[in-house]
Amino acid sequence: MKKKVAILFGGQSTEHEVSRVSASSVLKNIDLSKYDVYPIGITKDGKWFEYTGAIDKIESGEWEKDEFYKNPNGQEILFNREVDVVFPVMHGLYGEDGTIQGLCKLLTIPCVGPGVMSSAVCMDKVYTKYVLENFGVKQADYVVVNAHDYKNNKMDIISTIENKLGYDVFIKPSNSGSSVGISKAHNREELEAGLEEALKFDRKVLVEVALNAREIEVAVLGNDEPVAATPGEIVPANEFYDYEAKYSNAQSKLLLPANLSPEKLEKVKELAVRIFKMLDCAGMSRVDFLVDKETEEVYLNEINTIPGFTKISMYPKMWQAEGKAYGELISEIIELAVERDNK
């Protein structure tokens, strides 16, 4: 019997558009001989709809105007337990932070990807650092900035950052993905502007020393015995891998495998699996590293529990390089969700 799978897309995060593109790719490549699919779109204002129209309209955003194929029963499909598993192809806020995972847990429906705790910790860049510091994982030096403290003690915070980190630094909203709200500061003026911008997206901001490093990504797949694909490398078109470089600028390059020695490739794979286990991840995650160009020291950058599934995304590309077809990968992560729920 075919399993019934709800594919959730859209949502209220700043990554709404990226989610639609990822979901379109999943819907076009899922094995329909194994699964009956229920596409459920969530608008930016939080309304849920089952959408049975053209997949291309999901990617473009036109699905919201396609009233004939848009049914206001999206929530009921989950609440009435009409599906066997949920695949939240939703990046960022509410999709990747433990919120939808908690809803599925309450409804006793298997959910693709890590669970509530793991998703919440991995989504929050600051808490990821706090947790992994206790495991001795090497990370870039940082300062955490709170919106309330910044408002009342701006110059003290600026001085702390300058004294501890110097320049250059990266400024990142703690709970944001796809490089939304991230900037690089080379001086005080850019630091202040970057903090103001990042605080528009989150009340908590991470400021990190900017390493002269290469960006290495590792796809991890599995539950109790996860495995890692051969690492890939991002060569950004811009100064760093910002939103434009990820989704708009064709000059960014994805190298598979990463241009590292065989020994270093293996070390990065092993470290990715260790971090996956440390954070109690499950199903899938993409673990991103920075490798210092001079010393070749490996630093954790971040973990993505719902990695991009667009046609140019690194996660599926890394597994395709291992011989795992896109549709096969989708099937495997769905089955991993069911497997974990049955234990």
UniProtKB/Swiss-Prot annotation:
Residues 129-335 form the ATP-grasp domain. This is D-alanine--D-alanine ligase. Keywords: ATP-binding, Cell shape, Cell wall biogenesis/degradation, Cytoplasm, Ligase, Magnesium, Manganese, Metal-binding, Nucleotide-binding, Peptidoglycan synthesis. It holds the Pfam family Dala_Dala_lig_N. It catalyses: 2 D-alanine + ATP = D-alanyl-D-alanine + ADP + phosphate + H(+). GO terms for molecular function: ATP binding; D-alanine-D-alanine ligase activity; metal ion binding. It is found in: Cytoplasm.
